[in-house]
UniProtKB/Swiss-Prot annotation:
Keywords: Cytoplasm, Fatty acid biosynthesis, Fatty acid metabolism, Lipid biosynthesis, Lipid metabolism, Phosphopantetheine, Phosphoprotein
One Pfam family it belongs to: PP-binding
Gene: acpP
A molecular-function term among this protein's GO annotations: acyl binding
GO biological process terms on file: lipid A biosynthetic process
GO CC terms in record: cytosol; membrane
Keyword ATP-binding listed: no
Pathway: Lipid metabolism; fatty acid biosynthesis
Modified how: 4'-phosphopantetheine is transferred from CoA to a specific serine of apo-ACP by AcpS. This modification is essential for activity because fatty acids are bound in thioester linkage to the sulfhydryl of the prosthetic group.
SMART domains: PKS_PP
Originating species: Acidithiobacillus ferrooxidans (strain ATCC 23270 / DSM 14882 / CIP 104768 / NCIMB 8455) (Ferrobacillus ferrooxidans (strain ATCC 23270))
Protein name in UniProt: Acyl carrier protein
Keyword Phosphoprotein: yes
Length: 82
């Protein structure tokens, strides 16, 4: 199974319609990848579905980069899903 980082990046590519090479760990969803507020909501929903977890709104607001998404998912999903 792909690792968490690869799975997060795959979701970002699918949701934002960007090239895989644009999705670096440091990339900001809004500033670098062109996401708007609706895109970020849909991205969080897609991450929740991919990892079978719930990301509370107050936590989702703190996830602005690919690395922050990877870190959040890594810390909050059961090991069997990682």
């Amino acid at each position: 199974m792909d690792n968490v980082a690869d799975r997060v990046k795959k979701v970002v590519v699918e949701q934002l319609g960007v090239n895989e090479d644009e999705v670096t760990n440091e990339a900001s969803f809004v500033d670098d990848l062109g996401a708007d507020s609706l895109d970020t909501v849909e991205l969080v929903m897609a991450l929740e579905e991919e990892f079978d977890c719930e990301i509370p709104d107050e936590e989702a607001e703190k996830i602005a980069t690919v690395q922050q998404a990877i870190d959040y998912v890594s810390a909050h999903i059961p090991a069997k899903d990682a």
